[in-house]
Structure formats: structure tokens, C-alpha cells
Amino acid sequence: MKDPALLEQASELFNGTNINITTEGKRHLGAAIGSKEFHEEYSKEKIDKWCNEIKQLAKFAKTQPQAAYAAFIHGEVHRFSYFLRTIPSMGDLLQPLDEAIENHLLPAIMGTNNITQPERNLYSLPIRLGGLGIPILTDIAEQEFSTSVQITAPLAAIMILQGTNLPDPEEVKKTALEVKKLRDNIEKQKEEIVISTLNQGTAKAVEQAKEKISF
């Protein structure tokens, strides 16, 4: 149970059944269910593990930057995204992971000793906007979770009512389009801010990269 205060009431309600009621958190389908404390404990454990993996990947990136970048984009990012979409309020806890990416992985991939903040912001943009698609996780955590809740709301409502029908496909499609439109608007606004902080040469190079991608 998420709220320990309801333990006694729940125990009475399900008395005589085989249902096991606990106030301890549980892991379910790769996410955490339970109290805020359990969420944080579970998340810190995950994040510590990922930080170590990022540092190992950074060592590999010094000699194989393209392979390391591909492994990160097609592997690690998807794991992070699932985590952000299933556990709320993870922004602050993700700071060590962002630091591992910025201080270890990105310098190794780019062949430099350090990454400036304007560069980091640029690399966080989607590839179609001239970036590398390497997100700043603390910046996107809240948005990722809220859009996940929005998309799954129709199914969640049916489950709460113990219904047997799937959500209306048209409703799901409409919600997905709304979420995509919102995401595109946010990315476009961020792009404008990022470009405004770049020097003229870099900004021009970004525009040229976008033109090549669009063909």
C-alpha cells in the first residue's frame, strides 16, 4: 500500500482472502510501487548502477566514439525514458547521472576535455534539430512522466472500474497527437533558446546539419 495509514482498513476489508497486504514498496515491471521513500531508494540504486555503466561506456568511447554513441542512443536512453515515464518526481535524483554523461561520456565521444553549457544544451536537442539527442534528464523528467500519465489515462480509468474493454483507439490516437504536438512545441522553443547562445559559426553549422537531415 502506498499510504500506511490505510493498512488497518485494508486488512479488515480483505480479511479471509489470500491477498497479501504490505506497506513496503515493490518492484513491478521495472518500476517502483509504494511510498516516496521506496521510490527514492529504488531510484538511487538504479541511478548509481547507471552512472557506473556510463563511466565504463566513456572509457570505450575514447577509442570507439561512434559505437559508444550508438550504444547510448539505442540502448541507455530507452532505459532512462522508461524509468522517467513510470516513476514520478525523479528530477533531483537524476543529477548524478546527468553529471556522469556531461563530465565523462560526452567529452570522450567529442574528443575534448570538457563540455561547455551551450554545447551541452545543443547536444540535448533532437538530431532533426541539429543536436545529438543526448537528453538532460533532470530537464525532461517531469514532462516525460506527465505525458505518460496523459497517454495511459484512458486505460487506467478502465482498470480502476474493472472494465473489460480496451480504450477507444481514436481517443488514444488523439491523445498521442496532442502529446506529440506539445513535445514538438517544447523542443522548438528550446531550440530557439539554444541557438541564441551559440556563436555565429556554430549556429550556422547547426542550420546546415538540419538541412542535410531534412533531405
Where are these regions (language model features)?
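Short, conserved micro-motifs composed of acidic
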Residues: 1-24
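Non-catalytic, peripheral interaction segments enriched in hydrophobic/basic residues
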Residues: 1-2, 26-160
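Helix-centric, low-specificity signal for extended rod-like, repetitive segments
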Residues: 19-20, 39, 72, 121, ...
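Short intrinsically disordered, low-complexity segments
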Residues: 14, 65, 71-72, 90, ...
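Charged boundary/loop elements
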Residues: 141-215
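Intrinsic disorder/low-complexity segments
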Residues: 11, 32-33, 101, 204-206, ...
